């Protein structure tokens, strides 16, 4: 694998981990909380952000204004059924969500979830490293590159892996601080 391909793949893993982090509640209203919620709309699962305009009104309130009023109840139901622990208020035109402050117990749960997402990201990085190292060893066996080149490349791959794993750990500690901040 080329250096750029490896870095690109690892970057995508870090970005996916960050997207997972963004779906975790922190006690503040954030439109990305609703990213994983899909609504049954004309027989198909559709993300809320495709059906409505989502805005953060203040630090505790999210406003959802559907493009089609007929899907208002479906959006409300999907939010109620989600694992976010928030209750939508429907006024007939707009859904408002008041994001309550997190309890200490809920904060700890979300920290565990963030750790789980971080570990999944690290596993993805290690899989990329394993594939790249296997390719280097295969190229070495086939005589395409020398033993020294193979070792140098493997060391370089390990450096990339360490760099991106530390990036995920940094993002995890930032997210944990954000979650635990009262």
Curated annotation (Swiss-Prot):
The keyword Protein biosynthesis applies. The keyword Transcription does not apply. One of its GO terms (molecular function) is ribosomal large subunit binding. InterPro entries: Ribosome_recyc_fac, Ribosome_recyc_fac_dom, RRF_sf. GO terms for biological process: translational termination. Transmembrane segments: none annotated. GO terms for cellular component: cytoplasm. CDD domains: RRF. Disulfide bonds: none annotated. Keywords: Cytoplasm, Protein biosynthesis. Its main location: cytoplasm. PANTHER family: MITOCHONDRIAL RIBOSOME RECYCLING FACTOR PSEUDO 1, RIBOSOME RECYCLING FACTOR. NCBIfam families: frr (TIGR00496). Responsible for the release of ribosomes from messenger RNA at the termination of protein biosynthesis. May increase the efficiency of translation by recycling ribosomes from one round of translation to another. This is Ribosome-recycling factor. It comes from Prochlorococcus marinus (strain MIT 9515).
